[in-house]
């Protein structure tokens, strides 16, 4: 985004029923939250800014969205849409999670083109991955690759203008 209105008006849809909860260090803590009727319920399109400041413990811990959505094994697991420009990004992955990070701590970091500094929530990152911190919280973490083993994952990003 990095545009004039941060990322608040971007519409997000995610095919997930739960998120991985985070602790005070924003690490997945091994618990999961059913997202129905919470600020994390993006099963239908919602503007990112619509509920980002709601009084919810997980939003407070992360300063916004910085959570792994446990996506369903389906196509088009995540769609990000900018109604103003018509730009749409659709994401599908074979990995179990998509991390949605709303740039909650961008201030004081790098500058954008033209030298203007980024501010909090000036962008959104959408990252296909295994569950963060899974090496410490899963009985049989899939993030370990041993000598001789092979690893394959596929993530596709499709961009369109409507």
Question: Predicted segments — roles?
Answer:
Residues 1-162:
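An exposed, glycine/acidic-rich loop-and-rim segment of catalytic or binding clefts
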């Amino acid at each position: 985004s990095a545009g004039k209105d941060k990322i608040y008006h971007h519409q997000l849809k995610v095919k997930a029923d739960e998120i991985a909860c985070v602790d005070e260090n924003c690490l997945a803590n091994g618990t999961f939250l059913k997202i129905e009727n919470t600020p994390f319920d993006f099963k239908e399109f919602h503007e990112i800014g619509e509920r980002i400041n709601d009084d919810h413990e997980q939003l407070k811990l992360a300063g916004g969205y910085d959570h792994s959505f446990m996506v369903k094994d389906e196509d088009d697991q995540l769609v990000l849409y900018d109604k103003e420009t018509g730009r749409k990004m659709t994401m599908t992955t074979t990995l179990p999670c998509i991390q949605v990070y709303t740039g909650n701590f961008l201030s004081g970091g790098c500058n954008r083109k033209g030298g203007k500094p980024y501010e909090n929530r000036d962008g959104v990152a959408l990252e296909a991955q295994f569950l963060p911190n899974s090496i410490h919280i899963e009985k049989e973490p899939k993030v370990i690759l041993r000598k001789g083993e092979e690893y394959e994952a596929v993530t596709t990003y499709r961009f369109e203008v409507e």
